């Protein structure tokens, strides 16, 4: 497995993207087996499972979150940031309502400023994936309202 090779080469965190075809077919048992198989290949790594929320219905996000709650993953990650829309506050809150404090949430993609970052954390994210880290830090150091969020993309 690629995850095992990555771990053998020094990785201590593994990101995996779920099979959306499994979700669309309703094969949540297969999805659970897939996620746990990757985790079993390098059990000492932190495992983040990317669900690409922009490709899923709300009902599918709920079912995937329920499935991941049964898995050995550490994080549910909203997106890669490269597939349509990134994280939304609504989807982070929806995932949090299912996994509660049993899994961590990483909101990724589309977080363009301090206001977005704070809102994602308030919605339940414990980590953020953003290419705007410098801007966010600057806004926080200078006061969140000192600059408008940059909405030119991620």
Question: Where does each model-flagged region fall?
Answer:
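Conserved anion-binding
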Residues: 1-7, 11-73, 149-154
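Catalytic cores of alpha/beta
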Residues: 1-5, 56-67, 90, 94-97, ...
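Glycine-rich phosphate-binding active-site loops on the catalytic face of alpha/beta enzymes
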Residues: 8-23, 70-86, 107-145, 154
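Surface-exposed amphipathic alpha-helices with a cationic face
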Residues: 35-43, 93-100, 141
């Amino acid at each position: 497995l690629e995850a095992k090779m990555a771990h053998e080469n020094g990785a201590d965190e593994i990101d995996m993207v779920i099979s959306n075809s499994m979700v669309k077919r309703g094969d949540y048992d297969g999805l659970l087996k897939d996620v746990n198989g990757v985790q079993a290949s390098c059990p000492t790594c932190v495992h983040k499972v990317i669900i690409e929320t922009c490709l899923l219905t709300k009902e599918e996000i709920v079912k995937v979150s329920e499935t991941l709650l049964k898995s050995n993953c550490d994080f549910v990650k909203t997106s890669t940031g490269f597939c349509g829309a990134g994280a939304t506050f609504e989807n982070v809150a929806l995932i949090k309502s299912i996994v509660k404090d049993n899994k961590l949430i990483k909101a990724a993609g589309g977080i363009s400023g301090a206001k977005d970052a704070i809102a994602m954390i308030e919605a339940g994210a414990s980590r953020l994936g953003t290419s705007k880290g410098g801007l966010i830090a600057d806004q926080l150091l200078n006061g969140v309202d000192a600059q408008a969020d940059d909405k030119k993309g991620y």
